[in-house]
């Protein structure tokens, strides 16, 4: 059993294997192992610059840490008898650099600020991964929308045929939704990207450390202002989980529709075989399993958010060990989301939309009735509610032909539409879905000309977001270069 250098002074006796296993976060901490090494490097560089550690000790520690960064941590660092990766790395450093040098690394900090910093660094990386995958999904939607600006299909409310629209209009509706997800994730990044390092247990330290310097080395925008806030609060995790839950909920919605569209009684889309399975007994089956699993994954991410909120709701200031159990919820939410996004992008990119069926269904269920009511308002100055009642009654009577519409108009409004010049030919023209779509003039409507412009706008917005994402990655690379330069100046 490994000796616990942290318990050594205050506590006596050995822990049982069950206690060690129960308390250890080592498995989840694999997510932050590399971040921890970088935090240690930045901390040692700062200690040396502030003359809080001698040059020989700094060189021993940095040599060992750079070796871990290049070759990976030795397995001993992940010893499950240790409470966490931070203790594991410290023990490994003491073994590799000696007890004198290794014992100096923790000067001016606590595991509390150390873990909070590592969590923010790893969350930052995973947010960038999510954003990159989200860009790909949005691009797939924009590309398919560009192909289908004139593809007519029915729009639905309450899952009932409602009004004609275009496939581009539908696809760009989801792109807009995912664009807002992008905005939320960018916003979350700004609140993640602040440094707790140097806050120590919660009350800071009496050593003259430079928190701004370590923040700069690690790519943070600035140090957190309140040392208690820095170590005690995980609202950045809750916010990130909330954003991921919203994103996965939006993903679940489009999954649900694509599943429905792929059914034999809708036939709007044929999914690529790679994303489907067949039955073990029914040889004719083609099941949209990938979309179904993706729909289920959204429930898991929502569950991670619920668990996180429940976990932190009663925690007093400042640090509590409960927070250790928060981290796996974040990692799992990222894992489910970041697997789902590229798969959904592929599914949409390879989907075959059944344009003839969509066009045929576009007029089922009197989807064009609204336009006839609008026409009566425009041409004959009939109040909209009256026109609405006329057309609604005609639908109830079974047809929107001239005789029925005229008869209902006489009954409800004491108006003869025939005498005002309405003809059967005019009604047919008004009710044609192509005419209806061209008639749309309001911003954001499915008019094909507007859809072509909307595709360009969406594409520009995506490029702008991609540039912002590139800037975030450049900032992290620049910080890494600054840290490398500082290491070189020590002449290891």
UniProtKB/Swiss-Prot annotation:
Record GO biological process: arginine biosynthetic process via ornithine; L-arginine biosynthetic process
Annotated GO CC locations: cytosol
EC number: 4.3.2.1
Pfam family, one: Lyase_1
One Gene Ontology molecular-function label: argininosuccinate lyase activity
Pathway(s) of this molecule: Amino-acid biosynthesis; L-arginine biosynthesis; L-arginine from L-ornithine and carbamoyl phosphate: step 3/3
Position of the signal peptide: none
Family: Belongs to the lyase 1 family. Argininosuccinate lyase subfamily.
Protein name, UniProt field: Argininosuccinate lyase
Organism encoding this protein: Methanocorpusculum labreanum (strain ATCC 43576 / DSM 4855 / Z)
Gene label: argH
């Amino acid at each position: 059993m490994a000796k616990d250098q942290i318990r050594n002074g205050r506590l006596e006796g050995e822990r049982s294997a069950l206690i060690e296993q129960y308390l250890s976060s080592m498995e989840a901490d694999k997510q932050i192992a590399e971040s921890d090494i970088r935090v240690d490097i930045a901390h040692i560089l700062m200690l040396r610059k502030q003359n809080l550690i001698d040059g020989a000790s700094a060189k021993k520690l940095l040599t060992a840490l750079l070796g871990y960064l290049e070759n990976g941590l030795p397995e001993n660092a992940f010893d499950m008898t240790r409470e966490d990766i931070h203790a594991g790395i410290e023990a490994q450093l003491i073994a590799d650099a000696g007890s004198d040098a290794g014992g100096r690394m923790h000067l001016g900090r606590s595991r509390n600020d150390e873990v909070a910093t590592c969590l923010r660094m790893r969350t930052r990386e995973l947010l960038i991964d999510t954003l990159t995958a989200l860009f790909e999904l949005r691009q797939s939607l924009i590309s398919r929308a560009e192909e289908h600006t004139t593809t007519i299909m029915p729009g639905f409310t309450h899952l009932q045929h409602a009004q004609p629209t275009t496939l581009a209009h539908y696809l760009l509706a989801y792109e807009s939704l995912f664009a807002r997800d992008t905005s939320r994730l960018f916003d979350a990044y700004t609140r993640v990207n602040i440094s707790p390092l140097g806050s120590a247990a919660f009350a800071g330290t009496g050593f003259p450390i430079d928190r701004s310097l370590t923040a700069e080395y690690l790519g943070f925008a600035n140090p957190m202002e309140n040392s208690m806030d820095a170590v005690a609060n995980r609202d950045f995790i809750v916010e990130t989980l909330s954003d991921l839950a919203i994103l996965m909920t939006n993903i679940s919605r489009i999954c649900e529709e694509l599943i429905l569209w792929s059914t034999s009684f809708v036939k709007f889309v044929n999914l690529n075989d790679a994303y489907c399975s067949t039955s073990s007994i029914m040889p004719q089956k083609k099941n949209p399993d990938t979309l179904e699993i993706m729909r289920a994954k959204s429930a898991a991410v929502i569950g991670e958010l619920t668990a996180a909120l429940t976990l932190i709701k009663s925690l007093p200031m400042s640090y509590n060990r409960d927070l250790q159990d928060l981290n796996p919820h974040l990692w799992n939410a990222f894992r489910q989301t970041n697997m789902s996004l590229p798969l959904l992008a592929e599914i949409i990119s390879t989907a075959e939309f059944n344009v003839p069926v969509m066009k045929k269904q576009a007029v089922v269920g009197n989807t064009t009735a609204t336009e006839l009511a609008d026409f009566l308002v425009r041409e004959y100055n009939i109040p909209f509610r009256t026109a609405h009642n006329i057309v609604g009654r005609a639908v109830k009577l079974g047809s929107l032909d001239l005789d029925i519409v005229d008869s209902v108009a006489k009954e409800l409004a004491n108006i003869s539409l025939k005498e005002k010049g309405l003809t059967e030919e005019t009604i047919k023209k008004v009710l044609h879905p192509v005419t209806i779509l061209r008639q749309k003039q309001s911003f954001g409507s499915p008019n094909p000309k507007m859809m072509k412009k909307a595709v360009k706008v969406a594409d520009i917005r995506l490029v702008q977001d991609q540039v912002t994402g590139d800037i975030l990655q450049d900032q992290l690379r620049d910080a890494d270069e600054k840290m490398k330069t500082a290491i070189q100046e020590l002449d290891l």
